[in-house]
C-alpha cells in the first residue's frame, strides 16, 4: 500500500496596517476594504489530518510582531478577544512566536503533507500569508519607512476608489506559492458548496434559521453554517480563534473525503453554486409562506441601502416582485 494522504487545514485571524484607522477615519466600510486587501495575521493555526479525519498534528501560535503591537492588533475585527488570548497565554494554551519562527515550522510541515487548504483559501493563502510575509520582510529592513509611505497611498486608494483588478498579476488557483515552493491547494468552502451543502435540506435550514446573505439573495455558506448543518446544532457559533476554527474546518473536509477526492483549486464565488433564494422558492411546489416572507423582508430592508435606479436596487426590486407573486 502507498503512503496515506494527508491534508493541512489552515485558519488565521487577521488585523491590518496601523494606518488603516487613520485613513478610514471611522468609516467601517473603508476600514473593511483595507483589512481585506492588507491583512496581517496575528493568530496562526493549522491541523493536519489523514483521509479518515484522524488528527496527525495541531499547531497554533500568536504572532509577536502583530499581536503584541497594539497599533496593529487594535485594527482587528475581533480585537475585543484580546483578554481571551491573554488568559490562554497564562494557562499555557498558546504561545507568542515571531513570524519567522512560525514559518520555519510551517515550512517543515508543508513538506510532509499532500495538500494544503483552508475554508477560504483565496483569502488565507493568496492574501493573508503572502502579505504578512511581505510586511515582516519590510519591517526588518532599512526600507520600512519608505514602504509604509507607499502603502499609505495604496490604502487610501483602496478605501476611496472603485476596485480595479490588476490583469497583470499572476494568480494560480491550484497552488500555494511559498518561499520558492508550490503546494497543491484545495478550498474547503468550494468543496462544501459542491458536495456538502448544496441540498434542499440545507437551503430550507437556511430559510428557517435566518442563515441568509445580507441582501437575502443567497444562502449563507460559511464554515459556521456548514458545521451547524453537519452537526444539526443550529445554535453553534464559531469561536473565531484560529485553532478552534481550523479544527471545525478539518471536520468538514473529513466528512467530504469519505465520499469524494479532494478538489484542487479555488473556485471564485462558490456560494453561487447553490443558486439564489428566489430561484429555490420558485422551484418549490408549495413554498411555505413564512419562508417567502422571510426573504422578502430581508430584501425589502436591504434595498434601502441603495439609491433609486441603481442596478442592484432594481435587481432586488425584481426579486421582491417575484416573491410577492408566490404569496
Feature annotation, model-predicted:
Residues 2-8, 12-129, 133:
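Conserved non-catalytic scaffold segment of RNase H-like nuclease domains
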Residues 60-63, 190-193, 234-244:
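Acidic carboxylate-rich catalytic motifs and surrounding loops in phosphoryl-/glycosyl-chemistry enzymes
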Residues 79-199:
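Conserved DEDDh/DEDDy metal-dependent 3′-5′ exonuclease domain
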Residues 115-122, 126-127, 131, 204-289:
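Acidic, Mg2+-coordinating catalytic module of metal-dependent nucleases/exonucleases
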Residues 285-299:
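Short amphipathic alpha-helical heptad-repeat segments
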Residues 303-314:
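Charged, low-complexity interaction regions
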Residues 315-326:
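Short, charge-rich amphipathic interface segments used for partner binding and complex assembly
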Amino acid at each position: 500500500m502507498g503512503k496515506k494522504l494527508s491534508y493541512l487545514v489552515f485558519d488565521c485571524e487577521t488585523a491590518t496596517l496601523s494606518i488603516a484607522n487613520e485613513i478610514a477615519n471611522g468609516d467601517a466600510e473603508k476600514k473593511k476594504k483595507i483589512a481585506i486587501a492588507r491583512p496581517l495575521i496575528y493568530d496562526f493555526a493549522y491541523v493536519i489530518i489523514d483521509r479518515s479525519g484522524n488528527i496527525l498534528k495541531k499547531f497554533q501560535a500568536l504572532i509577536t510582531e502583530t499581536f503584541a503591537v497594539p497599533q496593529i492588533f487594535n485594527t482587528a475585527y475581533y480585537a475585543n478577544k484580546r483578554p481571551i488570548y491573554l488568559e490562554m497565554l497564562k494557562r499555557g494554551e498558546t504561545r507568542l512566536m515571531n513570524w519567522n519562527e512560525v514559518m520555519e515550522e510551517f515550512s517543515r510541515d508543508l513538506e510532509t503533507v499532500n495538500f494544503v487548504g483552508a475554508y477560504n483559501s483565496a483569502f488565507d493563502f493568496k492574501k493573508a500569508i503572502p502579505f504578512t510575509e511581505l510586511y515582516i520582510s519590510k519591517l526588518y529592513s532599512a526600507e520600512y519607512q519608505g514602504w509604509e509611505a507607499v502603502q499609505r497611498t495604496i490604502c487610501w486608494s483602496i478605501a476611496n476608489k472603485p476596485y480595479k483588478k490588476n490583469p497583470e498579476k499572476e494568480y494560480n488557483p491550484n497552488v500555494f506559492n511559498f518561499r520558492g515552493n508550490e503546494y497543491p491547494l484545495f478550498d474547503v468552502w468550494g468543496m462544501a458548496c459542491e458536495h456538502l451543502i448544496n441540498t434542499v435540506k440545507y437551503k430550507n435550514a437556511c430559510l428557517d434559521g435566518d442563515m441568509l446573505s445580507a441582501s437575502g439573495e443567497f444562502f449563507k455558506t460559511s464554515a459556521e453554517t456548514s458545521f451547524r448543518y453537519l452537526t444539526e446544532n443550529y445554535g453553534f457559533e464559531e469561536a473565531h480563534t484560529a485553532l478552534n476554527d481550523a479544527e471545525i474546518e478539518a471536520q468538514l473536509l473529513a466528512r467530504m473525503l469519505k465520499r469524494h477526492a479532494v478538489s484542487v483549486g479555488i473556485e471564485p464565488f462558490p456560494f453561487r453554486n447553490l443558486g439564489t433564494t428566489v430561484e429555490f422558492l420558485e422551484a418549490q411546489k408549495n413554498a411555505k409562506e413564512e419562508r417567502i416572507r422571510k426573504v422578502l423582508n430581508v430584501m425589502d430592508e436591504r434595498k434601502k441601502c441603495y439609491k433609486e435606479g441603481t442596478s442592484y436596487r432594481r435587481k432586488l426590486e425584481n426579486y421582491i416582485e417575484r416573491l410577492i407573486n408566490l404569496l
